[in-house]
Amino acid sequence: MEYLKMDESHVEAIAELEKMCFLDPWSANSIASELHNPLSDWFVAVDNGMVCGYVGSQSVLDGADMMNIAVHPDYRKQGIGYALIERLITALKEKNVISLCLEVRVSNESAIGLYSKMGFAVVGKRPGYYRNPREDAYIMRKEFAK
């Protein structure tokens, strides 16, 4: 498994993974626009040329928000999500970012478990944040060691 910075060659595969994993997926154009955003950091997990996972964030000053993460269903429970987030955190620390926030569906116990294992804590709740279906989101945050 390789963990690489996202480039143009990954956009279509990420868009397909979005469609596979989410009811309200990002378009290929939206994903591609992140390549030109200096505040964005996106990484992919590639296995034998296939994009099997990705993570993306945007940072402002010393904080960042994880915009999206997904792992192909055939590759789940293999540590890929964990490794992608670790790679993202390494890149953010290099930019002097000291914290990472994210939103997660309150029903997504698997993701909440992963984030908690990685040191994220619930710091708030956004009522009705998600649609398709409508659901609340937990806001989770991780502070990085300096």
Region roles according to the model:
Residues 77-91, 109, 113-117:
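Conserved acetyl-CoA-binding loop-helix of GNAT-fold acetyltransferases
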Residues 136-146:
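Terminal substrate-recognition subdomain of acyl/acetyltransferases
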Residues 2-74, 85-87, 91, 95, ...:
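Acetyl-CoA-dependent GNAT
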Residues 66, 100-104:
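Conserved hydrophobic beta-strand within the GNAT/NAT acetyltransferase core sheet
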